[in-house]
């Protein structure tokens, strides 16, 4: 049963909590149970690559074994929580939208831009269908939508949002691992960590560009820029 359906049946009689996959700290605690923790930078690289699904860190699995487990989780979610529940017939269309969003973690895009791209490669899907698929992927907790916040106008913008994955291993289990994707996956990791800590997270739009994340929790506001390395001439 989806969370929205639970709300319908149990109005006023339940409290919902969003459960995330393992944080980096939790990942290290799991790993200490069966092996020696390596250099922290190497561990972070492994965490980005292997993700934080608890089932993949109960013992020392190979990368291929991890991705097999995660792919099973992905397939179960796609086919049970999305395809079957919503009676989707054109599964190939849904999977193309999934692959596009997974490949474009950290990039701003819209349902229209996805539709335009798929049309350019001879797989036309209308905007409304793409938008519907994105909503269903959100409701199944595979994707998190991150809106843009105009820091000057102090308002949420409704265009060019970003989407982040519930876990970085989802991306690699579906698309395969490539080193050039690490920067955007690191951004995904930071986004999830801010959410775990109870922040409402948006992308900060400025006249000259953007701040990766504006994180708000009551009166506490953080401005976060994510980078793999900081180069300095000092």
List each language-model region with its residue ranges.
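Short acidic, hydrophobic short linear motifs in intrinsically disordered regions
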Residues: 107-118
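Short, basic interhelical loop/turn and adjoining N-cap
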Residues: 120-129
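Short hinge/gating elements
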Residues: 80-84, 116-121, 170-180
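A cross-kingdom feature that marks ATP-driven nucleic-acid transaction machinery
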Residues: 129-234
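Interdomain motor-coupling "hinge/lid" segment immediately C-terminal to the ATP-binding subdomain
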Residues: 3-108
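Short, locally clustered residues in the helix-turn-helix/winged-helix DNA-binding domain
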Residues: 99-103, 119, 195
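A generic structural signal for residues located within well-ordered alpha-helices
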Residues: 89-92, 125, 185-186
């Amino acid at each position: 049963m989806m969370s929205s359906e639970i709300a319908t049946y149990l109005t006023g009689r339940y409290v919902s909590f969003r459960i995330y996959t393992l944080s980096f700290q939790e990942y290290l605690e799991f790993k200490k149970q069966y092996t020696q923790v390596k250099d922290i930078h190497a561990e972070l690289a492994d965490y980005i690559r292997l993700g934080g699904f608890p089932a993949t860190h109960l013992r020392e699995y190979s990368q291929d074994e991890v991705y097999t487990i995660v792919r099973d989780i992905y397939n179960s979610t796609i086919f049970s929580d999305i395809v079957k529940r919503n009676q989707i017939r054109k599964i190939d269309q849904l999977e193309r939208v999934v692959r596009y969003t997974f490949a474009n973690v950290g990039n701003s895009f819209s349902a229209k831009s996805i539709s335009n791209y798929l049309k350019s490669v001879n797989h036309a899907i209308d905007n409304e269908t793409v938008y519907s698929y994105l909503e269903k992927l959100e409701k199944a907790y595979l994707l998190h939508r991150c809106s843009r916040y105009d820091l000057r106008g102090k308002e949420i913008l409704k265009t060019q949002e970003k989407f982040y994955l519930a876990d970085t291993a989802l991306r690699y289990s579906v698309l395969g691992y490539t080193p050039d994707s690490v920067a955007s996956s690191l951004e995904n990791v930071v986004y999830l960590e801010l959410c775990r800590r109870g922040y409402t997270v948006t992308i900060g739009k400025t006249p000259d560009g953007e701040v990766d994340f504006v994180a708000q929790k009551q009166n506490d506001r953080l401005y976060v820029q994510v980078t793999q390395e900081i180069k300095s001439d000092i």
